[in-house]
Amino acid sequence: MKTAVITQARMTSTRLPGKVLREAAGVTMLEHHLARLTAAGLPVVVATTTNLDDDPVAVLADKLGAGVVRGSEHDVLSRFALAVREFEPDVVVRVTSDCPLIDGDVVRRGVDAWAAAGDPTLYASNALERTYPRGLDFEVFSAEALLEADRLATETPHREHVTPWLYTDDARPKLNLPWERDASAYRITLDTPEDMQLLRILIEEHDAHRLDAAGLVTLLEAHPELVGINAQIEQKKLGQ
């Protein structure tokens, strides 16, 4: 059974334009993101847009050895469906490029848990009930389920955010993939200037890009002054 990681990336972020090509320790956030995913041992596809602004994203992703597809900016679900049709995985892991410190080992364990369940209709995620820091999120589902969502989802938030049609379906079985500790209060995602400030400090001064999930949380626990840099940031709600 072929599994692929599909990650979405674009330059035109509303709160932090060009964020995926901003740098920490001389390396772009997209490079950090893709490097962290190598621990999952899975092929990675970068789904970006057809906008000219995203040409550098496509060029860099290709240079780094990732697959690349380009599609609609706002209909991100169709972009993922395009990736599925082009690369033909049986199983999809969805992540987003605003997670430069994602833990590939955690992703791999999530894929194994999904496969062990033996149900192709299953939706699995470590964010159904949050225990991991925001920025380590991933989702696992069959390519067939993704294509079904692409055919049937009509609401704008469902198209823009890719998976709501799956995880809001009461009839669909779901598997939460919790951690043994609750670190959900921590934020190591990249959406605002404050997030970028924190990530740059974590990477450049504390080698966070070399730490696994447990190491990241231990680091944050030891430095509450760093946690405070972006503690006030509110995550966008569905439809925003």
Features from the language model and the residues they span:
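Conserved core of the sugar-phosphate nucleotidyltransferase
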Residues: V44, I102-Y186, Q197, I201, ...
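N-terminal glycine-rich phosphate-binding loop and ensuing alpha1 helix
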Residues: K2-T48
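Residues that recognize and position ribonucleotide moieties
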Residues: T14, P100, E139, T189, ...
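Short beta-strand segments
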Residues: Q8, V95-T96, N126-A127
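Short, conserved phosphate/pyrophosphate- and ester-handling motifs at nucleotide-, phospho-/glycolipid
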Residues: T192
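Conserved acidic residues
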Residues: T3, L42, D90, T121-L122
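Short phosphate-binding loop-to-helix
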Residues: T50-A116
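Short, structured coil segments at secondary-structure junctions
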Residues: A40, L64-G65, D170
